[in-house]
């Protein structure tokens, strides 16, 4: 914080972060600029992902071809919202879907086991899968029908939302933090009431 006060200029990656800084250090307001994070639109471009890459991804993750794919690309940490997403999925389990939690399989074994048990308790056995990180994230996003970003605490911005939208995939997130700046509700995705399971399920 002291270093922040001594800088000539401060760059925030979102208006959310800007407001947070000003709430704690109003004296930097006049030397603070918002520069939103970007995305490599050559890498995350659906026109640059060939069918072979998609097939390899589908086969590697054994993704069913006849079910909609809900994807949560995030490391396995509690604030990323894996548990609340499982709760929301339990409310729509009468509908066909498979949920891929990309990256969650690399998490701490105790937390991964906890998520698996919790999903089973909710009656979601066989409906969700925790996988390691994938090398070809653009191809993975092409497989998704919708991308979930249910962080239970506000993201400063959230790169996943931009990458998914660049690939033409809608994003469902809670309406707080940087998500309110990167997602156009009803156009490029849906913003649910923060930490509301029913609202997330509806979205």
Task: State what each model feature region is.
Residues 7-34, 39-43:
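A short, active-site helix/loop in glycosyltransferases that binds the activated sugar's phosphate group
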Residues 142-156, 169:
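Acidic donor-binding loop of glycosyltransferase active sites
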Residues 185-186, 190-197:
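Conserved acidic donor-binding segment of nucleotide-sugar-dependent glycosyltransferases
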Residues 138, 156, 161-166, 180-181, ...:
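Short alpha-helical segment that forms part of, or immediately flanks, the ligand-binding pocket
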Residues 74, 132-133, 149-153:
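Short Ser/Thr-rich beta->loop micro-motif in glycosyltransferases that lines
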Residues 170-173, 183:
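Short hydrophobic beta-strand element within catalytic cores of glycosyltransferases
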Residues 133-134, 140-144, 159:
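Short alpha-helical donor nucleotide-sugar binding micro-motif in glycosyltransferases
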Residues 58-68, 82, 86-129:
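A conserved nucleotide-sugar
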């Amino acid at each position: 914080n002291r270093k922040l006060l001594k800088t000539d200029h401060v760059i925030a990656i979102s208006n959310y972060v800007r407001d947070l800084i000003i709430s704690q250090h109003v004296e930097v307001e006049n030397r603070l600029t918002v520069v939103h994070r970007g995305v490599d639109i050559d890498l995350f471009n659906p026109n640059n992902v060939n069918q072979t890459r998609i097939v390899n991804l589908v086969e590697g993750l054994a993704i069913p071809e006849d079910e909609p794919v809900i994807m949560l690309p995030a490391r396995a940490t509690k604030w990323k919202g894996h548990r609340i997403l499982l709760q929301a999925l339990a409310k729509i389990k009468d509908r066909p879907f498979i949920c891929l939690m990309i990256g969650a399989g690399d998490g701490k074994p105790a937390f991964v086991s906890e998520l698996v048990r919790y999903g089973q308790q909710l009656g979601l056995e066989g409906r969700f899968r925790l996988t390691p990180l994938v090398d070809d994230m653009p191809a993975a996003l092409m497989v998704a029908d919708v991308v979930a970003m249910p962080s239970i605490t506000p993201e400063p911005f959230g790169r996943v939302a931009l990458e998914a939208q660049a690939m033409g995939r809608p994003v469902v997130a809670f309406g707080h933090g940087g998500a309110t700046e990167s997602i156009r509700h009803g156009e490029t995705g849906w913003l649910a009431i923060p930490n509301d399971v029913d609202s997330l399920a509806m979205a």
